Amino acid sequence: MTNSLKIIFLCTFLFSSTTNFLQSKPFESTYEPLPAEKILITNASIYDGDGNEYKNTDVLVQDGKIVAIGEDLPAPEDFRIIDATGKWVTPGIIDIHSHMGVYPAPGVRTSSDGNEATSPVTADVWAEHSMWVQDPQYALALTGGVTAFHVLPGSANLIGGRGVTVKNLQRTTINSMKFPDAPHSLKMACGENPKRVYGNRGQAPSTRMGNAAGYRKSWIQAEGYLRKLVEYEEKSDEAKELEYAPRRDLEMETLAGVLKGEILVHNHCYRADEMATMIDIAKEFNYKITAFHHGVEAYKIADLLADNGICGALWADWWGFKHEAYDMVQANIAIVDQARNGTGCAIVHSDDAIGIQHLNQEASKSLAAGRRAGFDISEARAMKWITSNPAKAAGIYDQTGSLQVGKNADIVVWSKNPF
């Protein structure tokens, strides 16, 4: 082989390899379901996760899927029968805001890996690369009916990195826990945390206006990066052979994924005015916020959230632990839910390894507070706050989050009404 041919071969290899990198999706889920049982659940009271309640209803499960729901379903000979008389059946609970795995138990510094607090923007880090697969908290969450959860980086940074949705089962690798085909998320944070962390070091951001500038600078960079990618991909094969593909940038890849609609934005934010600012920034750069997390003041802008299709992922009654968390009302979740004639999206989240064990009770507290405030909300609707709504916010509603024929049999049988 002549030197010129070697050079041509090498350049062609580099061009094709770089392009493949840009199109690759590393760390794919390798989840394999447990051996499936054939099960018929009979005579159950059901909250289906889509706002409906049924009595004396059967659920037929085969090959890990729901295959039939109805009254008096015939019992196939080789099916295990679970008599749910006096019991309740719901979809598996989903926690949209968890730090299990990245802050595992016991809580020691050597395995506390949720915040890469070395730069205000760390879009290049992925929470799944910090998760400890042996965290004993997973099993405790399972006793509370949690079948899937969404793990986020912490809130020290303006842009903290990618989140991941996982099945609640213990495996030896994180890829084998990852929920198949679930999109990545991007954790963003506004308010006190980023400006405190970096302001205390004498660097930006140290103010809320510094926060806003930091987001905007990052999105401007991401727009430029994405523009270069698009321009390169639109070139002819002959033109591509004459120049290098844009250099990979892990931080920009994540932000470009948001701009392309492939990565879902989950935004830590407490104050109503800051949530409104974040909505304005999202519109400036043409990306969508999927959910605001914590949102103690979400009730003030509930209609704005509904108008923009943004969920409020909220606590039932945790407030007052810092200044931006003071102005809370216990009907917060109910107000977000009932915005714009009931078109709002409310989610009860935990952010806590104890709270994740009791999300049904947290939802019950929120339901009671809403009723005291005068809202006529059914228990069947409140079940959406911990099932179908978080499933939608995690991008997995097509697979789980409600009891529908064809969906995964992520099912909880409760000894009593979960509320």
Predicted regions: what they are:
Residues 26-37, 46, 50-90:
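Histidine-rich, glycine-flanked metal-binding segment
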Residues 137, 142-293:
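Polyanionic/metal-chelating signatures
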Residues 100-103, 133, 156-159, 272-276, ...:
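Active-site environment of divalent metal-dependent phosphoester hydrolases
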